[in-house]
């Protein structure tokens, strides 16, 4: 079979997507009205969930300002208000797409540059609410907007994290930016704080939100996570957090942070162990054998807990994590592997050039790339089909999804050939398997042995 880029994605018989097809579009820092306007494009590309930026009260045009809450009791930010969010949810529901919300529960906005107290939202915003009561009452999710939500007694003492290897330190003190920055006021999970955060989550759930990405969950104690996320709130919801680690089982940060979170919360998480496996396998000197079965060695999360990814918003936007950015071809190979394999909910990151000064517009409208849409079609077509490893080596990994699909990822600069024994690895005979990235490339099984050619630095994904 001839093909062109390290990916072979061959699918036989384009079967109807199953109801639980689950690719998530991370519409990072998109205005809510933009998500609504692009609803048909999102549906047409095959996404089943959309993750939106935090729906709360925040100010400032920078992306990071969305992660500095001023008030949880209403939705009003440069990205949109409650009416915009309602329209977004309605548009997605009409197209069978679930909406997930990024939620910030660890801290509040750092406003030490303009005031000395810890009353939130504070005198300035309370004055704005009072001056325009009709508007702000329409943005309200819960609570009394005539008084503050939080006071100094609802926060841990002032102080910055200095020991990033100590969970107690990381979960008690503040995230700070250095150079005298006082940091993000860290919430104390007292009864009042917990009750207000529960009210916030219940209000979003009542609006039709179907999942929560818990921001900065690494900085929240097990007690706080389990106190806030009651069985009632979690019922029918996809809840997952981002705990950045450098690897899986055996790595210090996994054992101290991610493993306890998984063991004690019952929630899902970004699959940083698998991401580390991808980076290692695709990197110089790495072997694709690492991707044959990483979960068997604790280097991938269980599929029912994992949100898999090739990049998250924290990686390009934080200097300390930028070393994890894959080169553009490797990122494409990573997506092919993630969207071809069984296990986890793949997340696709798409922004508006928030790191344009360093990366150009690399991820702007990424969600609409034609090759990515082909991979998503493959993912949806083979969803629920069992995964079976066929072979792997330093350059490639090759596996099948039932009899419907075949995935090969070749990281090397030259073609990889594999003779597939169809008596051992059953495929449908006399049916065309077409590469979803190159429709002219076809495999038709007519004998026991079939030659599979995995082109250089390109992932072929073939479906019947």
UniProtKB/Swiss-Prot annotation:
One of its GO terms (molecular function) is alpha-amylase activity. Its EC number is 3.2.1.1. This is Alpha-amylase. Gene3D superfamilies: Glycosidases. The active site is at 215 (nucleophile), 242 (proton donor). Keywords: Carbohydrate metabolism, Glycosidase, Hydrolase, Secreted, Signal. SMART domains: Aamy. Substrate binds at residues 107, 213, 218-219, 247, 313. GO terms for biological process: carbohydrate metabolic process. GO terms for cellular component: extracellular region. The keyword Signal applies. It catalyses: Endohydrolysis of (1->4)-alpha-D-glucosidic linkages in polysaccharides containing three or more (1->4)-alpha-linked D-glucose units. Residues 1-21 form the signal peptide. Belongs to the glycosyl hydrolase 13 family.
